[in-house]
């Protein structure tokens, strides 16, 4: 009888050990899945923005006036990727992979002439913000990319934020604006600079390209 009791005791301990291991594996599996999904969404967001920007440039090729550009126009001419806009909705909201809004404005960054456009992405996390602002979106002048905005606006972007940029040599990081060039805060930012710049509010960061 004593032998049987001891055997039962060891069996219970072994079972608890197995359950603990299964629990650890389950938590690890969930964490790994969440990380993988986060990476997938971020990559998809970058793909969406790249496609949208390419479509805008192709639609306005040969033109130097973006004064009429807005979400409605881009939706109507089919420049918005299919997975960023739901035609069954009445709104003109363009949504990205993290379910935040994308808003496009004509840019007043070049001597008040609207010869460019600004694209804003809201409701992204600090980690996504860091990944985006450390990317090389195009340092070559031929790319058309001149500046980057990093903010923590909790409301929808209602107007372009990069009005203070008049040339690629300007430095306006105090206003959340970063430019290409050879200065210390030139974009793309370093990892350390990005970590300091992406100070997100609870609803997330806002990025402007």
Feature roles, as predicted:
Residues 59-92:
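Short, glycine/small-hydrophobic-rich surface segments
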Residues 89-209:
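Intrinsically disordered, low-complexity regions enriched in Pro/Ser/Thr/Gly and acidic residues
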Residues 2-41, 45-48:
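N-terminal single-pass transmembrane signal-anchor helix
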Residues 31-71:
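Membrane-proximal N-terminal amphipathic helix
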Residues 10-19, 82-98:
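Phosphate-binding glycine-rich loops and adjacent basic patches that engage nucleotide phosphates
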